[in-house]
Amino acid sequence: QVLFFDTLRQRANNMLSHEKAGMPPVLAFKYELVADAASFEPASNYQLLKILEVGDICLDDCLDPDKPPVIIIDPRAGHGPGIGGFKADSEVGIALHEGYPVYFVVFTPDPMPGQTLPDVIAGLRQFVDLISEQHDGRAPVLYGNCQGGWAAALLAADCEGLAGPVVMNGSP
């Protein structure tokens, strides 16, 4: 019992530390903020990150300019990346290893006041437009996991002709 309660204590301490730090994304990759949908109209609590490095390996020399960008949308349940971005062998790591420029959609724990699903899709569409512009009009691959998969499907329908292939993993 002592070990069980000590584990719960450590977990709570980790969560409190994470909250004090402002609940930053817990990606296992270095990144920079590309866009924050909180500043869009309509606003949502989603952000777009560009993955810059894997460990100490800079990506400038290993990205293939002929490959389309990849936008990964992870599940909306909880906070932080799921299968997509917390290990080098994740979707992010594998796409980077293959030379694709990778972007990752994250979100803050609380939605914007009055936020709706159409607001989220509108923000995601602006992310697609922005990334397409930054990559000479190339349509990004949309990669969605679980709830992120149905968001990717809705987004692809809204971005007809602007988005590339859609990969839906474990999506309802």
Question: What annotation goes with each model-predicted range?
Answer:
Residues 115-133:
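Alpha/beta-hydrolase active-site loop
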Residues 39, 46, 50, 106, ...:
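Catalytic domains of lipid- and phosphate-ester/thioester hydrolases
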Residues 60-62, 132-135:
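A structural boundary/capping signal
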Residues 154-158:
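Active-site signature of alpha/beta-hydrolase-fold catalytic machinery across serine-
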Residues 143-152:
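Gly/Ala-rich beta-loop-alpha elbow adjacent to hydrolase catalytic centers
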Residues 1-33, 40:
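N-terminal targeting or regulatory segments adjacent to alpha/beta-hydrolase or S9 domains
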Residues 161-172:
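A conserved short beta-strand
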Residues 23-28, 32-111:
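Short, surface-exposed "cap/lid" segments of acyl-processing enzymes
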